[in-house]
Amino acid sequence: MDSIEKVSKNLIEEAYLTKASDIHIVPRERDAIIHFRVDHALLKKRDMKKEECVRLISHFKFLSAMDIGERRKPQNGSLTLKLKEGNVHLRMSTLPTINEESLVIRVMPQYNIPSIDKLSLFPKTGATLLSFLKHSHGMLIFTGPTGSGKTTTLYSLVQYAKKHFNRNIVTLEDPVETRDEDVLQVQVNEKAGVTYSAGLKAILRHDPDMIILGEIRDAETAEIAVRAAMTGHLVLTSLHTRDAKGAIYRLLEFGINMNEIEQTVIAIAAQRLVDLACPFCENGCSSVYCRQSRNTRRASVYELLYGKNLQQCIQEAKGNHANYQYQTLRQIIRKGIALGYLTTNNYDRWVYHEKD
């Protein structure tokens, strides 16, 4: 029987090679089960004895500096491992259940971020996103659910800006998912008093040209971000809204007035990470092997709101008559399916059934 150290290392290496985003170690009444999340699918990897599961979770808790003896409360931890294939950052989260603790591991490989033209399904959209970086100040907002690729897009834009514009770029994230030696990266640490709002205030005194704000979570952070955008800084950030228009109303909920939105917001991009059609599987990949053998399995689509269309949407939010016309996520995904780029399940997963 392999040692628990070897089991844990093999598990991480396999997840890395499979390009899994998460590992789920789930205890059951008599045994346990391990799942890999590959793309959007949760795929069963193996069964495990209950005793081995408890030892494995305890081992990961020890490595990530959690309290091994505490099994009644949820805990979080993280660590970075050096594998033969490269470095990987792991974010751990335990959850007490009726069948012992469950553990989910977020797997974040530390390799180069693809350029925006390789991320975007449609090259024209990627070129438009890059054009926004020419602005010296203002705010560029990305919206979408967790796992829609917002952080990857932000870092792809950061790399482009660093290479072509030579700017002083500072990021504020919770947590820092991708390490980049070319930018100053600050991690939110609420226990130490480094909240989003406090961290952003400190960054403004550090002579930044470009600020990457992981997420606008509260009214104070929104206010400081808007102030930064109005005083000569280019701010890239994210919000959780269903579509691009929703970001306007979200900022209003945070107490940002219409004039400030008009003066600062350059563009809003609603993003989704969609499954590309597999040349081998008619109804989408069902096996880990098939998913692993394809280098490019997903791409990003963006609903872009900028220029006249953005101004018209702001007018609509004011209660005025508006006339705008831009491609919605529904139309973009439908176009991708019609061209044979995307699987039909993308439509059911990401599109809300409403009028265009």
Swiss-Prot record:
* Membrane topology reported for the UniProt record: Peripheral membrane protein
Localization per record? Cell membrane
- Main localization category: membrane
Effect on the protein upon substituting K150Q = Cells no longer transformable but still undergo competence-associated growth arrest; protein localizes to the cell pole
Instruction: Report the superkingdom from the record.
Output: Bacteria
What induces or represses expression of this protein, per its UniProt record? Expression activated by ComK.
State the SUPFAM superfamilies in the record.
P-loop containing nucleoside triphosphate hydrolases
Q: Name one GO cellular component term.
A: plasma membrane
GO function term, MF aspect, one: ATP binding
InterPro entries membership: AAA+_ATPase (IPR003593), ATPase_ComGA (IPR047667), P-loop_NTPase (IPR027417), T2SS/T4SS_dom (IPR001482)
PROSITE patterns given in the database record: T2SP_E
Disruption of the gene: reported phenotype: Transformation deficient.
Example GO BP: establishment of competence for transformation
Q: Which positions does UniProt annotate for ATP binding?
A: G144, P145, T146, G147, S148, G149, K150, T151
Q: Which UniProt keywords apply?
A: ATP-binding, Cell membrane, Competence, Membrane, Nucleotide-binding, Transport
Family classification: Belongs to the GSP E family.
What is known about what this protein does?
A: Required for uptake of DNA by competent cells.
Q: What is this protein called?
A: Competence protein ComGA
